[in-house]
Amino acid sequence: MIRIGCTTFSEHGSLVQRKTSKLFEYASVFPVVELDTSYHYLPKEKDVRNWLTQVPDNFRFILKVHQSVTTQGDLPEGMSMAEALTAFKQAIQPMVDAGRLYCLLAQFPNRFKCTKESVAYLDEVRQWFAAYPVAIELRDNSWYQPEFRSSMQAYMRKQKFSLVIVDEPKKLSTTVPLEPLVTNPAFAVCRFHGRNDVGWTATGPDAKKNRTLYRYNEKELSELRQAVEETAAHAQEVAVIFNNNAGGDAADNARALIEAMQIDYQQLNHSQLELF
């Protein structure tokens, strides 16, 4: 099955004709969502249970692991890594029990390069989340160089990591290629960030906002469709996440891809209009 959705559920005003959208409303259009709240702070079990009440049985969540896991931030105050991992796992257990967790996502920064030390760290990540499906996103193209590419893929397969299939700006020397490399046949993840060459490497207070300021055109969506179809030929489940939402374009692009692929999702939430 191919599930197409977006990052977050609350920032897609085009779905509801107002600034923010609710999870219940989002789940009337898309069957999967990526949540990054767990990247910034540890989720609370009560919030996880609340999310589950707002989505149908066939809806799936992708949860970003905490920033401390991917070397991009500090541990929660007063916690060791072991304590933080335990708290995280306890909080998401209701989602696991309900069968709604698609996978955990570990997105590493571009300074996380292909070195022996990085591979050793990924070994630790696998140990920390041994019982969970884990997708790994690599942002530096050193992992994709000819001398490392095959061994990198073999390593991902051995660890049962799903290497995230990424679309990002094409004109920068450090970005990774869009290649449908499936390293875990059970599930795959595609993340589409847009192709804003200038914004991708911008710095300053508006850097995050500009990084994903992009709207895919029809030709580019056709390229993404081909990548998704090639991925689906080698994976039982595929989750496609549009992250190009700085300008509110993710939901529109996601819906356009659903239409282009002629996917008709069943058992979504009823839309608000259908309730009256």
Regions found by a protein language model. Give the residues of each.
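Residues lining hydrophobic/aromatic ligand-binding pockets adjacent to catalytic sites
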Residues: 1-276
